[in-house]
């Protein structure tokens, strides 16, 4: 939403503003670009999040829930909710959607709470991967605690959106020559009077910078840095696959968040340092317009990074399109039959290889007229003297937890 700073006093009636500050060429170009980008995000990201969310819900219903899949489902839900209210905000910013005060406040609550929970969920996913790898023994977190964390996250998101709802209202815009305020258009905006700029507005911008910008970057970088260092100690095959995934995930997030945090910090500075003149008010609107696009871009790339990059999730999506995930019993029966067939083929292949090896060994023994003893070679770190060595404990636990982390990061 646009943020309007008006050099007047606050009253209970809808404010009327005569736009004496003409829109500059750069501001018009940036606002037009914002509208085009938001339209693209709505028409591409909306269906994409809907498909991913439906696939994840059906997969959870068929295969069961886990802590990562619960977080993934919440992430797709918040992104879809944000993109659901975004068209109304875009139309309002373009002066194409008249609305009342109550509907504007409702849209503000949904928008700011869903964006807040979306950023928090991304940080929670990173924290959960750190928890899995950091613990010596992998202990699954109970579903009750997971749901409690998400409940508290949504509660915090709603509390965070309260200031936005309080200061969201309908503003009637009029031309500078319309002294009687007869012709105009209404928009949903965050409305602040001049005396609230250095107190309420500054506090809101600083809070937004911390919650939407700095905190997710710090948590993602910290937790995935530990994840990255742990992956390097595993086997080469597991390392190359997971390192690529984590690198793409982290680089994409930081590439979007770094300019966003910089813009928000500069916007907070401009709020307090710049005077209330047309030139500076226009620059503030330009900076705010640039910063507004970043949360919407996250809603577009999150399903791509967390779902579509995973081979397992793509397989589930194909099964969803074929209708295989609609019947849980039929799907589980089909999976069981496939596993049984695979095990039968594997056993048959092993038996054939064993017979061939036995015949070849007997032939060599017959030709060489020599007896060969059978030795049982234990791999390093196996049972010795009735006890298992520590090297096996280290070599099995970390790859096992890493495998769980990689599949859980893929959203399945």
From Swiss-Prot:
One of its GO terms (cellular component) is host cell cytoplasm. Residues 55-70, 130-138, 225-240, 306-412 are intravirion. Pfam families: 7tm_1. Residues 388-397 have a biased composition (Polar residues). Residues 1-29, 96-102, 161-203, 268-281 are virion surface. Disulfide bonds join 104-188. InterPro entries: CCR1-9-like, GPCR_Rhodpsn, GPCR_Rhodpsn_7TM. Residues 377-412 are annotated as: Disordered. CDD domains: 7tm_classA_rhodopsin-like. GO terms for molecular function: G protein-coupled receptor activity. It is found in: Virion; Host cell membrane; Host cytoplasm. The chain crosses the membrane at residues 30-54, 71-95, 103-129, 139-160, 204-224, 241-267, 282-305. Keywords: Disulfide bond, G-protein coupled receptor, Glycoprotein, Host cell membrane, Host cytoplasm, Host membrane, Host-virus interaction, Inhibition of host chemokines by virus, Membrane, Receptor, Transducer, Transmembrane, Transmembrane helix, Viral immunoevasion, Virion. It is a multi-pass membrane protein. Heterodimerizes with US28. G-protein-coupled receptor (vGPCR) that constitutively activates multiple oncogenic signaling pathways including STAT3, AP-1, phospholipase C, NF-kappa-B or cAMP-responsive element (CRE) pathways. Plays an important role in viral reactivation from latency through activation of host CREB1, facilitating its recruitment to the viral major immediate early (MIE) genes. In turn, expression of the MIE-driven genes such as UL123 are de-repressed. Also facilitates virus dissemination via the extracellular and cell-to-cell route. PANTHER family: CELL ADHESION MOLECULE, G-PROTEIN COUPLED RECEPTORS FAMILY 1 PROFILE DOMAIN-CONTAINING PROTEIN. This is G-protein coupled receptor homolog UL33. It comes from Human cytomegalovirus (strain AD169) (HHV-5). The gene is UL33.
């Amino acid at each position: 939403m646009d943020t309007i700073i008006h050099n007047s006093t606050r009253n209970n009636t809808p404010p009327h503003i005569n736009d004496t500050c003409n829109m500059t060429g750069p501001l018009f170009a940036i606002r037009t670009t914002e509208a085009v980008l938001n339209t693209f995000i709505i028409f591409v990201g909306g269906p994409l999040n809907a498909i991913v969310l439906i696939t994840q819900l059906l997969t959870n219903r068929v295969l069961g829930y886990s802590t990562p899949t619960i977080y993934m489902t919440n992430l797709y839900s918040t992104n879809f909710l944000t993109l659901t209210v975004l068209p109304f905000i875009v139309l309002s910013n373009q002066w194409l959607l008249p609305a009342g005060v109550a509907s504007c406040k409702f849209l503000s609550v949904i928008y700011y709470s869903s964006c807040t929970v979306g950023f928090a969920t991304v940080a929670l996913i990173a924290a959960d991967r750190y928890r899995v790898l950091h613990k010596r023994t992998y202990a699954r977190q109970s579903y009750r605690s997971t749901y409690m964390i998400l409940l508290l996250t949504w509660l915090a998101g709603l509390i965070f959106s309260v200031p936005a709802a309080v200061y969201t209202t309908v503003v009637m815009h009029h031309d500078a020559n319309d002294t009687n305020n007869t012709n105009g258009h209404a928009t949903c905006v965050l409305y602040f009077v001049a005396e609230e700029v250095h107190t309420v507005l500054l506090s809101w911008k600083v809070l937004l910078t911390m919650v939407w910008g700095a905190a997710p970057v710090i948590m993602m970088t910290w937790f995935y840095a530990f994840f990255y260092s742990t992956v390097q100690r595993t086997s080469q095959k597991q390392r190359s696959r997971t390192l690529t995934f984590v690198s793409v995930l982290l680089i994409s997030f930081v590439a979007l968040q770094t300019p966003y945090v910089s813009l928000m910090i500069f916007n907070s500075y401009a709020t307090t340092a710049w005077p209330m003149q047309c030139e500076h008010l226009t620059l503030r609107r330009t900076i705010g317009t640039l910063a507004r696009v970043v949360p919407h871009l996250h809603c577009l790339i999150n399903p791509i990074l967390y779902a579509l990059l995973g081979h397992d999730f793509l397989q589930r999506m194909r099964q969803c399109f074929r209708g295989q995930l609609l019947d849980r019993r039929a799907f589980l029966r089909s999976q069981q039959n496939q596993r049984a067939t695979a095990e039968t083929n594997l056993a048959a292949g092993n038996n054939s290889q064993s017979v061939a090896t036995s015949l070849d060994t007997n032939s060599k023994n017959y030709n060489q007229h020599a007896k060969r003893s059978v030795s049982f070679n234990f791999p390093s770190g196996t049972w010795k003297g009735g006890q298992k060595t520590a090297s096996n404990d280290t070599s099995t636990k970390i790859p096992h937890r890493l495998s769980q982390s990689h599949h859980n990061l893929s959203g399945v």
